[in-house]
Amino acid sequence: MRTSKYLFSTLKETPNDAQVVSHQLMLRAGMIRPMASGLYNWLPSGIRVLEKVKNIIREEMNKSGAIEVLMPVVQPAELWQESGRWEQYGLELLRFNDRGNRDFVLGPTHEEVITDLVRREVSSYKQLPLNLYQIQTKFRDEVRPRFGVMRSREFIMKDAYSFHTTKESLQATYDVMYQTYSNIFTRLGLDFRAVQADTGSIGGSASHEFQVLASSGEDDVVFSTESDYAANIELAEAIAVGERAQPGAAMQLVDTPNAKTIAELVEQFNLPIEKTVKTLIVKGATEEQPLVALIIRGDHDLNEIKAEKLPEVASPFEFADEADIKAKIGAGVGSLGPVNLNIPVIIDRSVALMSDFGAGANIDGKHYFNINWERDVALPKIADLRNVVEGDPSPDGKGTLLIKRGIEVGHIFQLGQKYSEAMNATVQGEDGKPLVMTMGCYGIGVTRVVASAIEQHHDERGIIWPSDAIAPFTVAIVPMNMHKSESVQAYAEELYQTLLAQGVEVIFDDRKERPGVMFADMELIGVPHMVIIGEKNLENGEIEYKNRRTSEKQMIAKDQLLDFLKANVNV
């Protein structure tokens, strides 16, 4: 491709509204342009990368035995009503009417559509297992689209759905997809972790996220220093170690009128924060027990996902109103604690090991100090309630935990029969009776993969693609002062035609620009291999080569250049 014949729209300055590196560089490199909030045009360089990512995904999915289909973006409301998600889904689901006043949605996901398709096309257990996938546009009406294509309203996703007669068959396909995803992200050159995850609104039992490690990530990824253990922080098990110390001083009621937070209590009374607890009141699961107290250590954070799974806690999880707390307990939220508390109490594992700790007295402006379990208050139910912190023991007993930020680029679920049961998706079983199919689903955010690769691989000059396989071009020909030198122009043209004939994706910068501008643009868009042709070097029979990934330069003998590129460039 010649730059003179190409839509080469690079920017020197970073747009003010671009917050993260990938958004900044995708705009500057001329990969995308905004059209409206959360909506982007993809320009030629962006499309080249996007299609390469799709091709790698498609190759690995086909290799796994999955079969490609294509389903509509526009979906009839009846399917969502049938599954029960018409009422459950929030404002992210864009709903509209056609000219016949029939309800439709712009699909944020395709569980309903694929379940409907398969129940129409598959009738016998002999046709299963079946794994169908598509690469398709999705739309979620995000309240705050941000970070460019990382969290846009319209995006491209690869979503696959498998259908089975048994849980064992589902597990076998799930394992294949886990490995397939690992292969995909390895081929893309990404530093990623597959982590245990919560199933969220999709539903189901087992679930893994594939997280690209990057400081700009929105998720906390937890993994062990000495094993393969990895989990989303929502699911990572918090282990409490040690034994509870014997009680010391007697419990003491203290006036604390100006200490309504843990920070104020610690500061005013010189109390170690690990000797304090937070008493959090949440809505209970039954009318008989409308409020439940969850107690964690003062320096820990409540994990709402874990809390919601407790049978005593309402789902969806919700903190209690302060007025309800005051009416039931008689004290405000800054003065709550386990002693004489008249509602069910659940404490975190680490709290169960505490002794001589401080907590609210359930009287406004008062706290108890030197509280001890079993001496001053009965030991309540114990559960894992908190987020892990760095340095916690790994749940598998190997090493300690590290926490890094991650960007979710893939997610696989064992759905079970959530959708097939709701939508009566059955096949004839071996015994001739109707059998509800068991499902799995497997998604990759294709547009998000592109942004994630940039978040993880860039420098002050621009993008560094982690693999030649997804760079928009693999070789850049940069002829210096070509329009003033016949020898430079002739050799550049010859090299360009030769590389094209060899199947190399090459960009030939034939613009009338200063060399510095040409170098900057090629580094900005991340071309991995740059061939720099200068008149003096040509006279000496040499060509300059620069590697974008390492920034190393070297002189290559002109007659050895093609062999050098063949050995170093992935065609």
Curated annotation (Swiss-Prot):
GO annotation terms (biological process): prolyl-tRNA aminoacylation
Pfam families xrefs: HGTP_anticodon, tRNA-synt_2b, tRNA_edit
UniProt entry tagged with the keyword Amino-acid biosynthesis: no
GO CC terms in record: cytosol
Listed SUPFAM superfamilies: Class II aaRS ABD-related, Class II aaRS and biotin synthetases, YbaK/ProRS associated domain
Swiss-Prot/TrEMBL keywords: Aminoacyl-tRNA synthetase, ATP-binding, Cytoplasm, Ligase, Nucleotide-binding, Protein biosynthesis
Root EC class: ligase
Entry's localization field: Cytoplasm
Family according to the record: Belongs to the class-II aminoacyl-tRNA synthetase family. ProS type 1 subfamily.
Alphabetical list of HAMAP family matching this protein: Pro_tRNA_synth_type1 (MF_01569)
Free-text function comment from the UniProt entry: Catalyzes the attachment of proline to tRNA(Pro) in a two-step reaction: proline is first activated by ATP to form Pro-AMP and then transferred to the acceptor end of tRNA(Pro). As ProRS can inadvertently accommodate and process non-cognate amino acids such as alanine and cysteine, to avoid such errors it has two additional distinct editing activities against alanine. One activity is designated as 'pretransfer' editing and involves the tRNA(Pro)-independent hydrolysis of activated Ala-AMP.
Quaternary data: Homodimer.
Domain free text: Consists of three domains: the N-terminal catalytic domain, the editing domain and the C-terminal anticodon-binding domain.
Name assigned to this protein: Proline--tRNA ligase
Organism in which the protein naturally occurs: Mannheimia succiniciproducens (strain KCTC 0769BP / MBEL55E)
Lineage: Bacteria, Pseudomonadati, Pseudomonadota, Gammaproteobacteria, Pasteurellales
